[in-house]
């Protein structure tokens, strides 16, 4: 734990004069008082050794048998008991030095032990990082948080948050807290509702994000706002998403353009990574990739750029081809995509069967491929292609003997997504550097999309973003061709945040919503307070809100977001330690004028 702690100022009182992880040879012969938890206890040839742990690390204690009363007390100590000791620092013998401990050159000969809390048997060990079920870890989270890795994660999170505050304050940002009890909004995920006692039949909602408040702060004349904001969404858990609540670095700025925001956020991330992490950013400034380009090259708007594979468009090569499956996908709105995997053309049939199974899971009818072997091209589609077709394909894709190329054909978006899924699948063939951070900005998202179910034009991303070209674009361009000032920041295949330059002009907002089928009256009914504010002097503004939990998860090398949250819920949105959610008393329900009707089993 010494790596995470690094404290240099000790609070000296009757419990301690020093911290365990900071004792060094210069303190030889010095008297010390230490306090902490019994990490391990060992009996060696009549001597009792105790590893005493505090938040800075471990010191080894020695209890000698000549001190019979002290020795007897030490014998009765259980692991994880809390003790305070007095003793003298001595140097260890050369053969007994422990290079894994910061205090490994010294030990403390104990003269007095005070037991503050004698621990009962533990549900799982702290000293040995044994595999323990997540349910048990969450039920006894206060025990789990003593374990070294997760303890360091929580301390790192605190320091990262403090560093974020310092950086943004130096950039003239103002930290402002926005309300936790607010109004419900039906547009996003499910709200957590809070019944009002003073206003029977009415409800507050916990904020899914401070979106409207931060925009109103721009209208209020605050130039740069930020907040480490708690957000609440009633949605299911994932490895990178905690159910119920999460924290985001909420930011908004007035009088900015898209690149201004990029410069500030990527500058902050580069600073944090360089000063607080051993990880490396592969490219800085972060590359900007349009939505159209990222889908064409990587098949997803959340690409892991560490995977050394790219999708190629081979649609023109199959215009008029005798292979009708591909030829029929050369019309407007469709495409033929290829994914080359170098050096894998001689794999067994099982390799290709597994790949085809994955393609079908992604929604494909099958998986066409060509192996370029010594004896010539092989594969299920070779018989449909002429020698000239194969030669053109080989030259266009730079194929060599030993390579294999996989194909996808059909509607552009679905084909891109299937091939993107296969790119990720084949990414497992490569050893990706976990210390490499490949950030990128995804820009130029479409403003609208066609909703097949509703048979209408709908917003594709954020309805409150400014369309590129503003009113002129809305009045003169086909809706599906209009782009928005919307952007995502992605790292190693994980989306850290979405953001946008906001639409602060009421007439453009009415027009944008009108294209999506909303009347002026509907817009006023849903967003009247925002429209009213924008009519009273609103500056151009934009923002973003990267997930703090996800950023900590990436920098701490964790695959599960619950490893960087002190008291997370489980996958079923339950707090096993506190027993929530729980039933409430009839008196509480009566005060709120509520009656519980459970679903019939």
Curated annotation (Swiss-Prot):
Q: How does it assemble?
A: Homodimer.
Give one GO molecular function term: nucleic acid binding
Q: Which PANTHER family match?
A: ASPARTATE--TRNA LIGASE, MITOCHONDRIAL, ASPARTYL/LYSYL-TRNA SYNTHETASE
What protein family is recorded?
Answer: Belongs to the class-II aminoacyl-tRNA synthetase family. Type 1 subfamily.
Sorted alphabetically, the keyword list is: Aminoacyl-tRNA synthetase, ATP-binding, Cytoplasm, Ligase, Nucleotide-binding, Protein biosynthesis
Q: Which GO terms describe its cellular component?
A: cytoplasm
Protein source organism:
Pelodictyon phaeoclathratiforme (strain DSM 5477 / BU-1)
Q: Where along this sequence does the record place binding of ATP? A: 233-235, 495, 547-550
> Where located?
Cytoplasm
Please tell me where this protein is predominantly located: cytoplasm
Region annotated Aspartate, chain positions: 211-214
Question: Which biological process terms from the Gene Ontology are attached to this UniProt entry?
Answer: aspartyl-tRNA aminoacylation
Which residues are recorded as binding L-aspartate?
A: 187, 233, 461, 502
Put simply, this protein is called Aspartate--tRNA(Asp/Asn) ligase
Annotated site (Important for tRNA non-discrimination): 44, 95
The taxonomic lineage of its organism, from the top, reads: Bacteria, Pseudomonadati, Chlorobiota, Chlorobiia, Chlorobiales
Recorded E.C. number(s)?
Answer: 6.1.1.23
Taxonomy, superkingdom: Bacteria
Function comment: Aspartyl-tRNA synthetase with relaxed tRNA specificity since it is able to aspartylate not only its cognate tRNA(Asp) but also tRNA(Asn). Reaction proceeds in two steps: L-aspartate is first activated by ATP to form Asp-AMP and then transferred to the acceptor end of tRNA(Asp/Asn).
Annotated catalysed reactions: tRNA(Asx) + L-aspartate + ATP = L-aspartyl-tRNA(Asx) + AMP + diphosphate
């Amino acid at each position: 734990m010494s790596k995470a702690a690094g404290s240099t100022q000790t609070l000296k009182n009757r419990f301690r004069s020093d911290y365990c992880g900071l004792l060094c040879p210069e303190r030889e012969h010095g008297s010390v008082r230490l306090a902490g938890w019994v990490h391990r206890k060992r009996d060696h040839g009549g001597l009792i050794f105790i590893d005493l742990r505090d938040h800075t690390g471990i010191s080894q204690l020695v209890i000698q048998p000549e001190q019979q009363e002290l020795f007897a007390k030490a014998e009765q100590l259980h692991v994880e008991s809390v003790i305070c000791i007095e003793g003298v620092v001595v140097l260890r013998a050369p053969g007994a030095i422990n290079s894994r401990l910061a205090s490994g050159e010294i030990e403390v000969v104990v003269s007095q032990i005070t037991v503050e809390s004698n621990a009962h048997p533990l549900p799982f060990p702290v000293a040995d990082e044994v595999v323990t079920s997540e349910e048990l870890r969450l039920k006894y989270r206060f025990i789990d948080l003593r374990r070294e890795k997760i303890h360091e994660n929580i301390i790192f999170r605190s320091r990262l948050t403090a560093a974020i505050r310092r950086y943004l304050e130096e950039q003239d940002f103002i930290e402002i807290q926005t309300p936790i009890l607010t109004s419900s909004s039906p547009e996003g995920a499910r709200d957590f509702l809070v019944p009002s006692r003073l206003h029977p039949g009415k409800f507050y909602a916990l904020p899914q994000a401070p979106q409207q408040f931060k925009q109103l702060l721009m209208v209020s004349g605050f130039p740069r706002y930020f907040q480490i904001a708690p957000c609440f969404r009633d949605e299911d858990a994932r490895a990178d998403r905690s159910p119920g609540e999460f924290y985001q670095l909420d930011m908004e700025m007035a009088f900015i353009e898209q690149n201004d925001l990029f410069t500030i956020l990527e500058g902050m991330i580069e600073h944090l990574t360089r000063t607080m992490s051993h990880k490396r950013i592969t490219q800085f400034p972060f590359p900007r990739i349009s939505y159209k380009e990222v889908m064409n090259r990587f098949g997803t708007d959340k690409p892991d750029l560490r995977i050394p594979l790219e999708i190629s468009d081979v649609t023109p090569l199959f215009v008029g081809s005798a292979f009708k499956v591909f030829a029929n996908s050369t019309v407007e709105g469709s495409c033929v995509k290829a994914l080359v995997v170098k050096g894998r053309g001689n794999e067994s049939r099982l390799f290709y069967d597994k790949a085809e199974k994955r393609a079908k899971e992604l929604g494909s009818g099958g998986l066409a491929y060509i192996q370029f072997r010594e004896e010539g091209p092989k594969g299920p589609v070779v018989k449909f292609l002429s020698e000239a077709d194969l030669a053109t394909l080989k030259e266009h894709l730079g194929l060599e003997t030993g390579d294999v190329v996989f194909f996808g054909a059909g509607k552009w978006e679905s084909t891109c997504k299937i091939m993107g899924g296969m790119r990720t699948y084949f990414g497992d063939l490569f050893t990706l550097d976990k210390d490499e951070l490949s950030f990128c900005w995804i820009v130029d998202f479409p403003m609208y999309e066609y909703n097949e179910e509703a048979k209408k034009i709908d917003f594709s991303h954020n309805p409150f973003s400014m369309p590129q070209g503003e009113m002129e674009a809305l009045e003169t361009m086909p809706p599906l061709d209009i782009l928005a000032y919307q952007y995502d920041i992605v790292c190693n295949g994980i989306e850290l945040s979405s953001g946008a330059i906001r639409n602060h002009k009421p007439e453009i907002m009415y027009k944008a919503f009108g294209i999506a089928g909303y009347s002026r009256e509907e817009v006023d009914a849903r967003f009247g307070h925002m429209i009213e504010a924008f009519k009273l002097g609103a500056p151009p503004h934009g923002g973003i809100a990267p997930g703090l939990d996800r950023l900590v998860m990436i920098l701490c090398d964790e695959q599960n977001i619950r490893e960087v949250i002190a008291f997370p819920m489980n996958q079923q949105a339950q707090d096993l330690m506190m027993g929530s959610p729980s039933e409430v008393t009839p008196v509480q329900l009566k005060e709120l004028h509520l009656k519980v009707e459970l679903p019939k089993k």
